Amino acid sequence: MNPPIAFAHRGARAHAPENTLPAFSLALRLGATGLESDVWMTADGVAVLDHDGVVRTGLRKKPMSEIMAKTLPQHIPTFDEFISSLDKTAHVSLDIKDLQAFEPVCRSAGDAGFPLDHLWLCHPDWQELANRRALEPDVRLVDSTRLAKISEGAERRAASLREAGIDCLNMHHSDWSGGLTTLVHRFDRLAFGWDMQFDQVLDNGFRMGLDGVYSDHVDRMMDSFVREIEPFSERF
């Protein structure tokens, strides 16, 4: 992608409480072009954004699937609240923690007028995503994994993703190299890298051709973007 997407991991979590509407808003003000979060379903079928998917009730912790949406702590946003607050130019990357969320998320985004080709749905089982490709042909699907888990090899995986209509391979930044991004691009798939927290890591990621990077530190990420991408980007 030109330019690559700069995803704020759980919003501007290095600067504000993670996965909250203020954190997401701050990330965009700091220049992030994408937002990342995790989506779960409540007991009454509401898609909500939270990392762990558990809620403390008294001395106990309950999974999100056992909690009614109206009883959630106020800081946990629903996906509807989140998506309706966004500028339509932003990108959104969601880790699908409950596969039941796939259709409601796509439907809510469409109802809000959010461009579905800016919605990136990530899951560690690419075949589960492939099974859902026909449900929503416009949404972006992302295979989130580690290189060590790709037993068939990166080239075979990239070919499988192309055949299945999965748009992107997302791995830890340490799994990527310039040669591997080139291989993935040869199959017309995109390459995303996560856990990119430091200047050198971000700079190297942009230089090797990653199409999307994820960082907690939006200020560092955007400084790196200015150094490595902005002078060559079609957007500027």
Where are these regions (language model features)?
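Short, cationic motifs built from Arg/Lys/His that form the positively charged side of catalytic pockets
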Residues: 9-10, 36, 133
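Short loop-to-alpha-helix "cap/lid" segments that border enzyme active sites
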Residues: 71, 80-92, 96-236
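An active-site metal/cofactor-coordinating segment within enzyme catalytic domains
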Residues: 3-6, 33, 39-91, 97, ...
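Short amphipathic alpha-helix
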Residues: 22-23
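Active-site beta->alpha N-cap acidic-glycine motif
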Residues: 19
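Long, acidic (Asp/Glu-rich), low-complexity accessory segments flanking structured domains
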Residues: 1-14
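Histidine-centered active-site/metal-ligand motif
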Residues: 9-10, 51-52, 185
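Catalytic domains of carbohydrate-active enzymes, especially glycoside hydrolases
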Residues: 26-41, 161-169
